[in-house]
């Protein structure tokens, strides 16, 4: 029985119940008078209140008191909502019910010694800054992208030499937040805001002149999340993760994140075309062979990240000035050949057609994806046997 008794259950039991049901189906509960399913729970060591009360909110999550502590719950689902019966940030689901709940802000560089929840966290290891961004399921909404860009710019002002973009232990990034977009009253406009906010983050990384950057993929990455990683000077991945470097499966979405600059630069024009048109998942061995990443190692996220930090320390020591100068020269030469603004303008022109054009394929695909509507048939890029069968049927029959 996963039902939570907030008056009796200790924090560790509440967490076990919530984590046992995370993903599907979630734990059914009453929150501020609304019957919802709860997801993604984290312990809170400092905040206290009456058991069962919502005592704080932060970046879309809510903090609920237990009999001996508190837990953060980041996502809720209202299955009876006719318009939005899917997972969303808790604050979006609860809306005005949270008016009296205090906002507990926390600096990104606050000490990590106390148990709490925050999506974005920054720490330093000598001359290496590490920016963690553990977004639920890797989805990045407009607001999350804006917070991440602000955090990155803050990290870039620090007297360090290397910035590690660590993502989260489960997911690095999966690009735009389709659930938040689907929940919007204006999904086309929200899609536009979201992709521009992601592009702003990529641009901040691409144009960094003071630091070397490392994308450390502890967890899986998909769609725009893969191309965000390519904006870093060096891309390292944990051996067991999976990449999905393509957009077209989402209703022929063209994509942005400066991918038309970043992917051919690493994989070549033909390689970039094969990757984006193939629409297949990719392991790290193949990603290394194709040039998308520069290294693969580590069995666990913690082991992987420890080694990444050591490599980043080496980058900060060995020929740092020469590497930084070479980075600046390369960026200047690339900018002279074709400005980043042109790449972005071209990509967004195609995205505008996806969002606002007559072809509604993206909106239909997003709607079905978020609401878990199964496809009528296996897509042709996966069902290759159909093409083989059609080819065989067209071949002249040999006499028997």
Role assignments for model-derived ranges:
Residues 193-196, 200-204, 215, 226-227, ...:
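Phosphate/pyrophosphate-binding betaalpha-module
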Residues 170-173, 222, 375:
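Short, active-site-adjacent cap segments at secondary-structure transitions
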Residues 85-166:
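Conserved CoA-thioester-binding segment of acyl-CoA-metabolizing enzymes
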Residues 207-210, 216-223, 231-242, 246-322:
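Crotonase-fold acyl-CoA enzyme core
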Residues 293-362:
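C-terminal long alpha-helix characteristic of the crotonase
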Residues 126-131, 145-187, 200-214, 238-242, ...:
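A structural preference for short, pocket-lining loop segments at secondary-structure junctions
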Residues 2-115:
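An anion-binding loop in the catalytic cleft
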Residues 337-400:
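C-terminal extensions of enzymes
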């Amino acid at each position: 029985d996963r039902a939570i008794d907030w008056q009796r259950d200790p924090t560790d039991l509440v967490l076990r119940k919530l984590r046992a049901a995370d993903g599907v189906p979630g734990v059914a509960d009453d929150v501020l008078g609304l019957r919802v399913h709860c997801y993604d729970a984290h312990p809170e060591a400092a905040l206290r209140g009456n058991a069962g009360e919502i005592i704080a909110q932060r970046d879309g999550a809510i903090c609920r008191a237990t009999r001996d502590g508190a837990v953060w719950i980041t996502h809720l689902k209202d299955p009876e909502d006719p318009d939005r019966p899917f997972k969303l940030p808790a604050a979006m689901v609860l809306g005005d019910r949270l008016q009296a709940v205090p906002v507990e802000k926390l600096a990104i560089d606050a000490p990590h010694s106390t148990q709490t929840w925050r999506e974005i966290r920054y720490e330093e290891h000598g001359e290496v800054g590490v920016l963690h961004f553990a977004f639920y399921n890797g989805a990045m909404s407009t607001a999350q992208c804006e917070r991440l860009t602000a955090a990155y710019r803050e990290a870039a002002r620090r007297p360090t030499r290397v910035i590690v973009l660590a993502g989260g232990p489960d997911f690095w990034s999966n690009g735009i937040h389709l659930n938040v977009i689907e929940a919007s009253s204006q999904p086309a406009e929200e899609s536009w805001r979201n992709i521009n906010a992601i592009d702003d983050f990529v641009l901040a990384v691409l144009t960094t002149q003071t630091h070397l950057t490392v994308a450390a993929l502890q967890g899986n990455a998909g769609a725009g999340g893969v191309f965000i990683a390519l904006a870093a000077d060096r891309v390292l991945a944990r051996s067991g993760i999976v990449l999905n470097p393509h957009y077209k499966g989402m209703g022929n979405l063209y994509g942005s994140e400066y991918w038309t600059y970043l992917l051919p630069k690493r994989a070549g024009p033909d390689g970039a075309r094969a990757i984006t048109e193939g629409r297949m998942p990719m392991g790290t061995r193949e990603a290394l062979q194709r040039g998308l990443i520069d290294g693969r190692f580590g069995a666990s996220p913690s082991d992987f990240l420890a080694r990444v930090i050591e490599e980043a320390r080496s980058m900060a020591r060995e020929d740092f000035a020469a590497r930084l100068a070479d980075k600046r020269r390369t960026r200047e030469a690339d900018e002279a050949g074709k400005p980043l603004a042109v790449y972005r303008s071209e990509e967004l022109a195609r995205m505008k057609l996806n969002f606002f054009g007559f072809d509604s394929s993206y909106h239909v695909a997003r709607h079905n994806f978020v609401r878990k509507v199964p496809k009528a048939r296996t897509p042709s890029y996966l069902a290759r046997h159909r093409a083989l069968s059609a080819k065989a049927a067209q071949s002249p029959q040999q006499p028997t």
